[in-house]
Amino acid sequence: MGPIDTSQRLARLRELMQERKVDVYIVPSEDSHQSEYIAHCDGRREFISGFTGSAGCAIVSMTKAALSTDGRYFNQAAKQLDSNWILLKRGFENMPTWQEWTAEQAEGGKVVGVDPSLITAFDARNLSETIKKCGGSLLGVQENLVDLVWGTERPARPSEKVALHPIEFAGKSFEEKISDLRKELQKKKCAGFVISMLDEIAWLFNLRGNDIPYNPVFFAYAIITQSTADLYIDEEKLPAEVKNYLGDKVSLKPYGSIFEDAKVLGQSAQNKSDGEASTKPPQKFLISTRASWSLSLALGGEKNVEEVRSPITDAKAIKNEAELEGMRACHIRDGAALSEYFAWLENELVNKKTVLNEVDASDKLEQIRSKHQHFVGLSFDTISSTGPNAAVIHYKAERNNCSIIDPKAVYLCDSGAQYLDGTTDTTRTLHFGEPTEMEKKAYTLVLKGLISIDTAVFPKGTTGFALDAFARQYLWKEGLDYLHGTGHGVGSYLNVHEGPIGLGTRVQYSEVAIAPGNVISDEPGYYEDGVFGIRIENIIMAKEVKTTHKFGEKPWLGFEHVTMTPLCQKLINPSLLSDAEKKWVNDYHTEIWEKTSKYFENDELTRNWLKRETQPI
């Protein structure tokens, strides 16, 4: 998708900034719940900049505008930003961070404004300090200025119905989860926990929604104390079945009343603290480090609030047996769907010489997936990319702006689905003609990295930060690399990107150790701008493994892969694989055949394709 002219939007925004005596205005990607994926009504950064990627921050001064994003989106942003914008490439040498660039624009006593509901309290403090060093100041602007520019064209906030997530898939009742949470709160001697992250609320109450595309969550807040559980949600979203399910164990309150109630709680905590002996530390409310500045301020700020990594995030990341079994089951069905799709696509392109574009193909994949048990929808927008488009890491094909699939070029498909029993995310790179030697080399080096993570054995306490290099080592030896993380946590019929664990160089991945029950993607890649892109992605689950020795008496961990989709035999150069790696590929393909071939007893086309693609190398 090419650039749109943002001149009028920026001019109107600058008028509003001038009226409010704001010199620089920040437009984050996130919504008021700090969601990575957002509802259309919260797409403020996309509206003002024209950049449609899921990550980034826009900064507008009276004379300049900048967009900062990470390596996944450099190519996309360069294509989508018009001449009004400067692209700040995050992580590039000699390139300022968006915070540094903002501070530069604030030199000489200028005021930087931001909607306090769209930035975390932690980030607001750090940003304020950075700006102060340049002589500027940070101001929370309660009225969102981009919303005013957007006006009546801004989409309405979704209000979809909420549904129960059955215990057979959740594995634990919401009463048990709240009880576990209260034990954690008791350990921390706090007054309660104010929850703002949407996936945490959905997980805690065993509820699912449809307010954000691809993410089965709903707009809500919650406050849990030792004696109360309050859910802040628009009541019309709750069917009678859900209200009966929650019963008298949960008090329902209007979504919009959270900030007033937070102010009351904050004042109450302060009054209680003031009235007690000074030797007794005051009980604070916990909020996530991802909670908004607005929420922190409503509770009374730092004197009443302790920011922590959410105990719900930690609990949610360790899947129980029902969730793990669901992930295994849904990936078998999803693998069958992908095999059917790839067999169909090859037949159409090679045998029938059908002309298909990238969107035609992704639509067919969704149609095939939708036939399978427990299918709800996609878990993200399918990346269906041919040739040079595959080098755009988060490429998005549009109906009126996409390419015809070239059977003589690399085809990269990164896709996933939401099933009642789990969430999938799989990437396969294929070639329907004769790949070049460089394409085969790149694919095989990426495959070696994937196998290295899959077969890794490591002591308890090891982080995803430490494991990341396992996946890159073979590319590094050739002077190659990729500009994205190696893996992210995956939810159980929840967000496809889930913290706090992952594989990569982000600071957060050095803070939390991999633990049994974690579900993570394993997705190394390699990209040549304007030529081709390679990525292979499996979902893996951490587990305890037996070792010959047990140094330090620690448990040792490894992974179980659950993705059941064949690799592309045509792109593998066996001479670059060790005997152990060849055995891994052959064993993996045997497992795929055994688990998915039953779906094709009456589908000769797919069965023959699957048989061919799972032959020993």
UniProtKB/Swiss-Prot annotation:
GO terms for cellular component: cytoplasm. Mn(2+) 2 binds at residues 414, 425, 537. This is Probable Xaa-Pro aminopeptidase P. GO terms for biological process: proteolysis. The keyword Metal-binding applies. Its EC number is 3.4.11.9. It comes from Ajellomyces capsulatus (strain NAm1 / WU24) (Darling's disease fungus). Its cofactor is Mn(2+). Catalyzes the removal of a penultimate prolyl residue from the N-termini of peptides. Disulfide bonds: none annotated. Belongs to the peptidase M24B family. InterPro entries: Creatin/AminoP/Spt16_N, Creatinase/aminopeptidase-like, Creatinase_N, Pept_M24, Pept_M24B, Peptidase_M24_C, Peptidase_M24B_aminopep-P_CS, X-Pro_aminopeptidase_P. Mn(2+) 1 binds at residues 425, 523, 537. It is an enzyme of class 3 (hydrolase). It comes from the Eukaryota. Binds 2 manganese ions per subunit. SUPFAM superfamilies: Creatinase/aminopeptidase (SSF55920), Creatinase/prolidase N-terminal domain (SSF53092). Pfam families: Creatinase_N (PF01321), Creatinase_N_2 (PF16189), Peptidase_M24 (PF00557), Peptidase_M24_C (PF16188). The keyword ATP-binding does not apply. It catalyses: Release of any N-terminal amino acid, including proline, that is linked to proline, even from a dipeptide or tripeptide.
